[in-house]
Amino acid sequence: MGPTWAVVCGVVASDGFGWRGEDWIRLALLVLLVDGGWGTLWSSLGGVNWAKPLRRWRHWRFGAPFATPPYTLPNSPGDRISRWLGQLGAWWRDVFWPACGPAFSAIVIAFAVTVVLAVLLGTELLLLSAATLAVMQLGLAWEGGRGTVAPHWDALVAVMMPWLAGHVAFGALGLRSLGLALAYAISWGAAWRVDSPWERALGIGSQFLAAALFVVLRSPLAAGGLLLLLVPQVALFPWLRRGQSAAWYARHARPWLMAAMLIAAWAARSL
C-alpha cells in the first residue's frame, strides 16, 4: 500500500495528470513498475540472507573440475579455471540455490520487468530505476546482506523513490516535491523505531518541517492541516509506555501519515 500511495502523492504533486486515457495507462504502468518491479526486487534482495552462502564460498574447495581442453598442463591457467568452475558449480548447486534460488529467480524476473517498464515510461524513469537499484544495494550492504533491512532504507525505497517516480512521470521534478518526499520517507521509517526517543523526535520533526515549508510558502491552511494530523500521531505515544510495540504504533499512525502525505502533495501542486 505504501509505494502505491506514494506514487499517487507524487502524481498529485506534479499537477500533470490530465485524466485522459493515456494518462491512466501511464499511471497503471507506473504502479506496475513500482510495485511489481521495484517492490519485488526489494523484497527479494532484503528478505534473504545472502551473506551466509557467500561466506561458505570463501572456503569452498569441493566439486569435480570441468572438462579441460586437451593438453592442458597441471596448474596451468586452463587447469585452474577448470577447477574453479567445478567448485563454483558445486557451490551453486549445493549451497547457493537451496538457500537463495527462489529469491534469485524473482530478482531476475523483476529486473527484466523493471527494465521493460522503465523503457516504456521514458528516460527519466529509467534513470530513476537505476538510482533506486543503487539505494537498494546501499541498504543491503548497510545490513551486511543478512536478510534484514533497516526501516529508513525501506522507507527510501517504499516512499521517497515512488513519490519521485509519480512526479517525474507527469511533470518536471522540483526541490519542493523532493523535500516533501524525503521528509515523509524519514517519518515513515522512524515510525518503526518509535521506541527510541531520537527516532520519535526525527519522525515528528520531519513532518513539522514539512508544515513549516508551507508556512514559508504562505500556505497557512496546508500547514495547519499537516500540524493537525500530527496530533493523533503524538497522542499514540503514551501507549508505547504501556507495552505496545513500534509495529503497533506504525500500524495505527500510518493512516494519519498517509493523509498528511496527500495533503502536502495537493498543497504543493497549487504553489
Predicted regions located by residue number:
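Hydrophobic alpha-helical transmembrane segments
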Residues: 1-141, 154-196, 201-271
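Short acidic/histidine-rich active-site segments
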Residues: 151
